[in-house]
Structures are given as structure tokens and as C-alpha cells.
Curated annotation (Swiss-Prot):
The name this protein goes by in its record: Autoinducer 2 import system permease protein LsrC
Keywords, sorted A to Z: Cell inner membrane, Cell membrane, Membrane, Transmembrane, Transmembrane helix, Transport
Periplasmic side: 1-13, 60-69, 114, 176-212, 273-283
Similarity comment: Belongs to the binding-protein-dependent transport system permease family. AraH/RbsC subfamily.
Length: 342
């Protein structure tokens, strides 16, 4: 049972999402509706995209804490290009390229220059945030064209065009990681770096690709953010990196690398977003959101740690069971033999 839970964490994440959807329905029947699902999904799109990118990095046994700054920087570039008169497709492509380059730079620092990921991305977190503020002068970007907002307008079944694009990306990335040799390279790199090199996996290239795609996902999240609210504050993206990592951990992506599924990260992002909607239903002030999400994350980390310890004890017990078996009891000599000896 313990091994099943450990190997199928996305199932437990799905159960948590279902429970968090059903239980509030006892307080308000209107909460149990398709409208609620589409509303939560619309709010979760940014975090889902960031969790997808973070999954790739975490599978290679690294971590990126600069994605929030990349999201803000890319959103600012998008707004500046649109206000300068560039078309929406050109602005979006330039934004995605900027995110890709920012992620590539992170990957170079980690894979080629051998700087620990947490240190490298802490540095670029400040760098990208500084670039964002230099471009804007600390001001908000407003007056974005109406065509940008159309990207987040309901299109089919209450889901926007960018929402359908997110669904397609989730399906493609799930297939890529589960069914292709290239996707499995991320798992191998994170699970056993030296073993992966001996198998011929280009581990440095895989890690750079992971960081680059992570940056691209952050740029796409910046586009979604700008299209949803119609303006870009000077603190866009602040704190999103921690939520993305939390979503991955909640969905079963291991901080030690080499295990987890993209669906689990998506469910973790959905769960964190759904907490916000439940708090609104319960009329709990918004400043409780981060506190409750943090408590949930700590509970999951404690549970995950205890589960790993229990599995390791069980494996050790099975491995050494034959050495720990008590010796067979010695049969006492029969009374007849005792008389003959006498």
C-alpha cells in the first residue's frame, strides 16, 4: 500500500482536488457547477504553465527560483511591444524568445559553469527583476490593446483560446515524458547523473533544455497574466516561483529528481488555486491564502518524508529478513534414549 501511494502520487493529488471540490458543495450547492470548474481553471492557467516548466527542471535534480522574475520581465516586454505598435503575434513570439533565452542562460550557469542551481537562479532572480524595473522605471504598463484580452475570452465550453493551448501543452508534455526516449532522459539525468552519462545521455544538454523550456513556459505565463488583467503592475510575477515549486511537490515531483509525472504537477497547481476559491466561498480574508497553502505544503512534505522512511525500513526488512530469522528450535532428547545412556 505504501509503495502504491509513493508511485502514484498523482492519484492522491486527484483525490485531494475532488474532495476540495465536493466538500464546499455541502455549504453551497451552486459551487458544484461547470462554471466553478472553468473559473478555477482560468485562474490556474498561470500556475499550471509554471508548474510544467518547473517539473522539467526538478526532474533533472535542479531547481529554478527565477521563473517569477522571468514571467514579470516577459510580460513587461509584451506590453512595451504592443504599446509601441507591434502586432500581437510579433510581440508574443518576441516574448517567448526572451523567456527561452533567460532560461537558456540559467541552464548555462548550472550545466556548463557548474554553479549550484539554487545559487545561480537566486542571482538571475534579481537580475531579471532589475531589468524589468529598468525597462518600466518602476511604473505600471497600461493601455494594452483589446485584442490581447481576447486571448483569455471564453471560446469553447467556457474555455479561452489560451486555455485550450494550455491543455494541448499538458497533453503533449505528458506524452513526451512518458513515451519518448528524449523525455525519459530527464528522469535518467535526475536519478543517476553518472549512470546517465555512461548510457550516452548528454546530461548537460538535457539540463540546459530543461531550464530553457522552463523559461519559455514562464514567458507564456506572462502572456496569460497580461491577457487576463489587461495591464502589467511593476511587481508582476513576485512569489510565483515558490507556488510553482509547491505545486510540483504537492503533485509528487521529487525534490531529489528522477521521479514524478506532469499530471501530478498540474493537479498540484489546480489544488493550490482551488484553495483560493474555497476561501472566497468561506468568506475568509485573502491574506490567509498563503498561510493555508504553506500549511498544506508542509503537511505534504512531512507526509512524503514519513512515507519515504517507512518504505526504506520495509525494503531493509525484506532485504535482511533471512539473516534475522530465529534459529529452529532444538528438539529435546526422548526419554528412551536417556535410559539407554544411563
Amino acid at each position: 500500500m505504501l509503495k502504491f501511494i509513493q508511485n502514484n502520487r498523482e492519484i492522491t493529488a486527484l483525490l485531494a482536488v475532488v474532495l476540495l471540490f465536493v466538500l464546499p458543495g455541502f455549504l453551497d450547492r451552486q459551487y458544484l457547477s461547470v462554471q466553478t470548474l472553468t473559473m478555477v481553471y482560468s485562474s490556474a492557467q498561470i500556475l499550471i504553465l509554471l508548474a510544467m516548466g518547473a517539473t522539467l527542471v526538478m526532474l533533472t535534480r535542479n531547481i529554478d527560483v527565477s521563473v517569477g522574475s522571468i514571467t514579470g520581465m516577459c510580460a513587461v516586454l509584451l506590453g512595451m511591444l504592443l504599446n509601441a505598435g507591434y502586432s500581437l503575434p510579433v510581440a508574443c513570439v518576441a516574448t517567448l524568445l526572451l523567456g527561452l533565452l533567460a532560461g537558456f542562460f540559467n541552464g548555462v550557469l548550472v550545466a556548463w559553469l557548474k554553479i549550484p542551481a539554487i545559487v545561480a537562479t537566486l542571482g538571475t532572480l534579481g537580475l531579471y527583476r532589475g531589468i524589468m524595473l529598468l525597462w518600466t522605471g518602476g511604473k505600471w504598463i497600461e493601455g494594452l490593446p483589446a485584442e490581447l484580452k481576447q486571448l483569455s475570452a471564453p471560446l469553447l465550453f467556457g474555455v479561452s483560446a489560451i486555455g485550450w493551448l494550455t491543455i494541448i501543452l499538458v497533453a503533449f508534455m505528458a506524452w513526451l515524458l512518458a513515451k519518448t526516449a528524449f523525455g525519459r532522459s530527464f528522469y535518467v539525468t535526475g536519478d543517476n547523473l553518472q549512470g546517465a552519462r555512461q548510457l550516452g545521455v548528454r546530461t548537460e544538454a538535457i539540463r540546459i533544455v530543461a531550464f530553457s523550456l522552463n523559461g519559455c513556459m514562464a514567458a507564456l505565463a506572462g502572456i496569460v497574466f497580461a491577457s487576463q488583467i489587461g495591464f502589467i503592475p511593476n511587481q508582476t510575477g513576485t512569489g510565483l516561483e515558490m507556488k510553482a515549486i509547491a505545486a510540483c511537490v504537492l503533485g509528487g515531483i521529487s525534490l531529489l529528481g528522477g521521479s514524478g509525472a506532469i499530471i501530478g504537477a498540474v493537479l498540484g497547481a489546480w489544488f493550490l488555486t482551488q484553495i483560493d476559491s474555497v476561501l472566497v466561498l468561506l468568506r475568509i480574508p485573502a491574506w490567509w491564502n498563503d498561510f493555508i497553502a504553506g500549511m498544506v505544503l508542509l503537511a505534504v512534505l512531512v507526509f512524503d518524508g514519513r512515507l519515504r522512511c517507512a518504505l526504506e525500513r520495509n525494503l531493509r526488512r525484506q532485504k535482511y529478513a533471512r539473516f534475522m530469522m530465529p534459529p529452529p528450535p532444538v528438539k529435546p532428547a526422548s526419554s528412551g534414549k536417556k535410559r539407554e545412556a544411563a
